[in-house]
Amino acid sequence: PSNWRVSWVNQETPALDIPAIDYVIQGDREYCRLQQELNEANERNDGHAIARIHGQLETLDAWTIQSRAASLLHGLGFNQEEIAQPVKSFSGGWRMRLNLAQALLCPSDLLLLDEPTNHLDLDAVIWLERWLVQYQGTLVLISHDRDFLDPIVTKILHIENQKLNEYTGDYSSFEVQRATKLAQQTAMYRQQQQKISHLQKYIDRFKAKATKAKQAQSRMKALERMELIAPAYVDNPFTFEFRPP
């Protein structure tokens, strides 16, 4: 829906002088917009605007934003001293944690996460898993970590043979469902191929015989009408080996 609030993880982190916690708070775009409007209203001494904006900030639970941002940073591995350090003092991996904290802080109806555990240690991964389990919006998550996916996801979207297939359940359930689907499709494909072969042999044998031409023609039409079952598609395994020194 066009009115959904979408949150995502920025891939770039500028080397800023501002404290880490202030950078994370910038992730709440609506809060920052209202703060800017409040500053302008204060400069104009516009009481009506100030009251209105305070009401909107109250709705956003703005008065707890510092503690919420600090809680996110602590969960992602920052200590109390580090959350006050400038963004530019952190390495690339830790800056990505700041970007992740930004995305989690921003109120959203749709949260997009692409390999969010890449720069996290085990404690941070466990914390993030618990946080995402209680997330109230719609989460679109890409990850190669099945142990991370299983407790969180309830649907799997699988791209296969240029088609998008939906499976209900966690990743382990998806593997079982897909294996069952492939086995069924393989069995149906083989059964149909046997039927096609049987019909084709009959056609080849009797199409030139006057006494059997009608039956052969009927089988030809049956072949033409038949909706072909595709063979089960299995991804080619990727393998390589190091060259001997």
Place the predicted regions along the sequence by residue.
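Amphipathic heptad-repeat alpha-helical coiled-coil/stalk segments that mediate oligomerization
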Residues: 230-245
